Amino acid sequence: MSEAKSSQPDPAPEQPKPFVAPCHDRPPSATLQWLRDGWRDYRAAPGLSIAWGTFCMLLSWSVAWMAWRVGGWVLLLSLLSGFVFVAPLLAFGMYSISRKLCMGRTPTFAGTLRAVRRPIANSLVFALVLLVIFLIWARAASMVHIFFPSTGTLHLREMAVYLGVGSAVGACFAYACFAASVFSLPFIANRDVDVITAVVSSVNAVLRNRWTMFAWAVIVATLTGVGFMTGMIGFIVIMPWLGYATWHGYRDSLDVDGWDVLPAHHD
């Protein structure tokens, strides 16, 4: 007598994830709401915000001091210009704070450190990408040096050409880095997603909402400049605030429901 086979339905095949996260259209005025939401998070977790901001300030001081001791003002300006390439990686802990607050939970310092370590593999890959961009930028900056006036007397017109070309080249690399990182890192911090999908989704959001994201880039650059003008003391407030605001911009701009949420009980 043959044994009856169990009639269990076959498990449904896993739905393939899209290559890029859908993007919502957002007006330039949305950036002001992101800033308001970011400031609300800063006030909701002032101790953690000040701690992370102080860390950014001390790190910036250390880099500036070493650059000045080793290479003088030329290396100092180069490293400060390259700050835009590494600053996004400092924001993982801040994304964790906003993530917890959005869930109605209380963030802790230990939890933010664990959240920074969790996507370490994707972070290292992204850091490698930023390093490549930074090295290309450094090479381009050295090539721009040919526009530096070679005569003993510096004329305003010659300096204007040099500064204009250098600023244009730096702005192109900075905006490319901005497009790749602005929403990809919050995406990685929040969902089970690979680096390529996160970066493509971020670039797509920048291209689709070009004026909104241009306005956001101007805001980020302006506030970062204010931080430098205060001897980097302003980073205590500015860096966490921008990190939180970027998190809310990511949630407002990308539809990431197609990817699994990373567990929050280890944050």
Model-derived features: positions:
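Hydrophobic alpha-helical membrane segments
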Residues: M1-D267
